Amino acid sequence: LFVLSATSADAAVANALVDIIGSMFPIFKLNALRIFIFLILFATLGYINVKGIKEGMLVVKAITITKLIPLLLLVIFSWGEVTVDNLVINSIPTVEDLGKISLILFFAFQGAESGLSISGEVKNPSKNIPRGIFISVVGVLMLYILIQTVSQGVLGESLASYKENPLSVVANEVFGPIGFTILTIGAAISMLGNLSSEILSIPRVLFRASKDKVLPLRSLSKINTRFSTPYMAIIAYATSGFLLASFGGFQQMAVISSASILLVYLGVTLSVIKLKRNEAKRTTNEFRIPGGYLIPILSLIIIVWLLSNLERKEVMGFGAYIVLLTIIYFLKDKIWKKE
């Protein structure tokens, strides 16, 4: 489920990236050309990461710095163009609409758990990783709120009309055509950074799962003798992302990604409740969630509510996928013995 969430998230981001390019150059809205761009995108990022983690990290660091600058400049300089009347809430969505919107919106907040894949290289991970995740989520939340506020304040009700590239339209209102171009490029770089970081980290989860015989695919644990990288896992992951991006749109992939990771979070939440019962046995140096059972129970309620907004065909699809994974899990030992 975690890998499905990551691959479908990459597919969603890839679609959003091409949508943004298409807002400037309509020719990129052609389906054949979109698929070709997906191929180049995933093949290039896969190749960079096969060559080595150093090259992959350099790309991630450079893109991370580059993508934040336009967003911060937009937030800082847009306040003078904000109209207070545009921030007034004139109508409240129904509970059903709010649930469907929240399921897609949740897509923007996932990914913090990726830091767990490198927890073995972090000093005192049981304490520092949870704190790091909390700080990063709060920081991202504040940035999202500021961006939404200035966007709504500048564009008002017309914001809903710009689904493909809204921030660039805001920048156009504030800075003129040069602002539109810079934010469009910045948004594309931001999405490219997301893809590059995912293709850097998630294949190593597949590699470890195969090596530990959690996945019945021995080939995923192969290491490239020249670059010392899990090349088969990287190729498999990049190929999966390309196929999902080619056959699904942004909204469809975002919902699949959100629902998949919510199911993972559901399991984690239930585990936290169980661990709370044995809290007295834990060492004092570990991070502890304050409030007793309050936070995990609230999380459980919210997750169930979000998942309840899935359509029937999506529920059936996830049910079939979970059944398939369960069968593979119970057969994996026999498969490994045959290999």
Model regions: which residues?
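Transmembrane helix-loop junctions in multi-pass membrane proteins
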Residues: A14, I48-K54, T83, I178-G179, ...
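A generic transmembrane alpha-helix motif of multi-pass inner-membrane proteins
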Residues: L74, S260-I261, K274, I289-E339
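Membrane-interface loop-to-helix entry segments
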Residues: V18, A32-E81, I92-T94, I133-S136, ...
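TM-loop-TM module centered on a large, flexible mid-protein loop between adjacent transmembrane helices
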Residues: D19-I27, F134-S196, L215-Q252, I256-S257
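Alpha-helical transmembrane segments
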Residues: L217-I223, T269-R288, W336-K338
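Hydrophobic transmembrane alpha-helices that form the core helical bundles
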Residues: L1-F42, G46-V50, E55, A187-R208, ...
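Alpha-helical transmembrane segments of multipass membrane proteins
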Residues: M24, A43-Y47, V75, Q148-V150, ...
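Helix-loop-helix junctions that connect adjacent transmembrane segments
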Residues: F28-L33, A62-T184
